[in-house]
Amino acid sequence: MANTKKTTLDITGMTCAACSNRIEKKLNKLDDVNAQVNLTTEKATVEYNPDQHDVQEFINTIQHLGYGVAVETVELDITGMTCAACSSRIEKVLNKMDGVQNATVNLTTEQAKVDYYPEETDADKLVTRIQKLGYDASIKDNNKDQTSRKAEALQHKLIKLIISAVLSLPLLMLMFVHLFNMHIPALFTNPWFQFILATPVQFIIGWQFYVGAYKNLRNGGANMDVLVAVGTSAAYFYSIYEMIRWLNGSTTQPHLYFETSAVLITLILFGKYLEARAKSQTTNALGELLSLQAKEARILKDGNELMIPLNEVHVGDTLIVKPGEKIPVDGKIIKGMTAIDESMLTGESIPVEKNVDDTVIGSTMNKNGTITMTATKVGGDTALANIIKVVEEAQSSKAPIQRLADIISGYFVPIVVGIALLTFIVWITLVTPGTFEPALVASISVLVIACPCALGLATPTSIMVGTGRAAENGILFKGGEFVERTHQIDTIVLDKTGTITNGRPVVTDYHGDDQTLQLLATAEKDSEHPLAEAIVNYAKEKQLTLTETTTFKAVPGHGIEATIDHHHILVGNRKLMADNDISLPKHISDDLTHYERDGKTAMLIAVNYSLTGIIAVADTLKNHAKDAIKQLHDMGIEVAMLTGDNKNTAQAIAKQVGIDTVIADILPEEKAAQIAKLQQQGKKVAMVGDGVNDAPALVKADIGIAIGTGTEVAIEAAGITILGGDLMLIPKAIYASKATIRNIRQNLFWAFGYNIAGIPIAALGLLAPWVAGAAMALSSVSVVTNALRLKKMRLEPRRKDA
């Protein structure tokens, strides 16, 4: 191979020499590729022709064989970005680097997230590459107080703005002279006075624009700094030219534009300050989550209570929490009982009763009892830490709707500069032939009215505020793409057990005396069946004392038979009673039929061969399940139930909550296929589940929604997590998505519309440069302000919300 390149990849999943040989053989089948795979080091070294192949092709080949390639992720803080052209350029350069799988740069958060192959590159190389582009970059420090850093930066912007405004205000008065024929002191019209005021604004306050423009042009790019630097420099240096003519006596009335350059810079700084201030509010939701974390814990060591910093708590430590204190970390109660306010997690204001062996979540509030607990999850593994991580990732992610804005931003500045040059040529040759000033003013107006910032901020600000507001309500979107996809959903499929129902059977009906119940519970107490557990718990709630069984026998398919204190007990169905010649009165038979029709498991009880009672057990509906289904129907969304239960039970539950479509008797492995069937009908499907067996269906669906009380596998497979299991959050999640996407469209319409309309108006000479500059400064502020409206959105779905 004449032109060769070498790359090394870390491979995961190899177990023997056959694995490494298989990968090596497959890679070497590619044209002009020489690959060696080492099982011991778990690395593949590949020499290849870069004109024919790239690293991603080798990764796809390895993954297609069923193995993985190690990928690491790093988050970087970037400062110095001024508009969408900056973030687009950094993103493009990072994605072209060897070893980078994917890089996204968020202008709003001023952060980059990069997935890379550690054998090809590292975080330091990424930082260095960004710095070469002219921006400051560093690896994100999670322990660093980002809020105070941003507050300092905002304060610095304000100081520069004030200084610039003080120097520009006298120059601004000159504009009023031209506009309103006002009289002002002669000093204000003196060229030297104007020069002294404008120069520090241009080259000290405005130096940042020159630096930004130079760095971008040096690296073959162009951003907002280029537009500002060129536009203000044109006005400033033309004024210098006129001033020299005045000093030489060539003119007694120089046409100076010092006020244009200085006021433009001041207005742009004002817009940037307002933008930064508004952007800081977009992360309020994350700041509020961070503020929920406990700062210290009371640990029990050698019989003594000690207060220690939260970061010193380890798994297995014994902690004491008193009334009014926050639970420091996730754990399990080993002593005491209390009520816990979990509203920060679930949004539910009513405290939850907690006893020994119950789990407690870090940062929730202990209301009224002292408890002793064992720490089970600490640091970054706690529930709150995971919530914060999901919200951070969602806020820094990109929605597919942003792609068009990103593409346009990359070409925006060169196009605007070209339009400005064309404007100058047309004016000086056709509109006002040979007259320099009108051509200059029109071209400056074109340069300064164009705003790539609004394009870059349109989507990420809405995503940040929208996902933050959703998180405050217990709805966690994993990323911008899930926000965008959710608004398209027209069909929602709900798992039954643990999703629509509580997943814990309870006694719903009982007819009989306490003695019969005591004997029944005693007979069932050694069984691990959920129905037996429900009966035993019911008896304990009645404070009945359970004794011991003398004999016990299960009657397969029919029930049980037991002897307790010389009493013969039969518990089961009609067949069991009939086999023992026990007749059923009509009202008992009718009750049995009624319970079965309602999807309940009904059991007859006979003591000493006489019917003494009937009991019904069922998995109860979750609170608000019926209301949630109704809201989804009101939004025009079809709702279906998917369950492995028999059709009668499923139909009974569906009838109670108002679900029309029931898919029952489904094996766990068939759930994903049922989702695919609905998708083949052209439906956009969301699957809601909580168990391990729901994970394939959650992945297959257009959107997977996991119930937060469910398994980690289900939560990992889903794009949205509903904290606490309240089904009312499902229509709220869909509404949050719709409201956020609607807000993004408004922003994009404004950003595109502003530039499409503003640039031609400026080119026609209908706007003074300072008016154009003010419009540019306020355009990005308006986009951020519109996004901030989402902070106040009430997550109340509308009927058939579009």
Curated annotation (Swiss-Prot):
Any GO CC annotation of this UniProt entry: plasma membrane
GO MF, one annotated term: ATP hydrolysis activity
Binding site for Cu(+) 1: C16, C19
Keyword tRNA-binding on entry: no
Transmembrane feature ranges: 161-181, 192-212, 224-244, 256-276, 411-431, 438-458, 748-767, 771-790
Top EC class, one word: translocase
Sequence positions that bind Cu(+) 2: C83, C86
CDD domains, alphabetized: HMA (cd00371), P-type_ATPase_Cu-like (cd02094)
Membrane-topology descriptor: Multi-pass membrane protein
Superkingdom in the source lineage: Bacteria
EC identifiers of the protein: 7.2.2.8
Ranges of residues in domain HMA: 5-70, 72-138
GO biological process terms held by the UniProt record: copper ion homeostasis
Residues binding Mg(2+), per UniProt: D690, D694
Disulfide-linked positions: none
Enzymatic reactions: Cu(+)(in) + ATP + H2O = Cu(+)(out) + ADP + phosphate + H(+)
Keyword entries, A-Z: ATP-binding, Cell membrane, Copper, Copper transport, Ion transport, Magnesium, Membrane, Metal-binding, Nucleotide-binding, Phosphoprotein, Repeat, Translocase, Transmembrane, Transmembrane helix, Transport
Residues at the catalytic site: D495 (4-aspartylphosphate intermediate)
Subcellular location: Cell membrane
PANTHER family, sorted: ATP7, ISOFORM B, P-TYPE CU(+) TRANSPORTER
Function per UniProt: Involved in copper export.
Family statement drawn from the similarity comment of this UniProt entry: Belongs to the cation transport ATPase (P-type) (TC 3.A.3) family. Type IB subfamily.
Protein name: Copper-exporting P-type ATPase
Taxon lineage: Bacteria, Bacillati, Bacillota, Bacilli, Bacillales
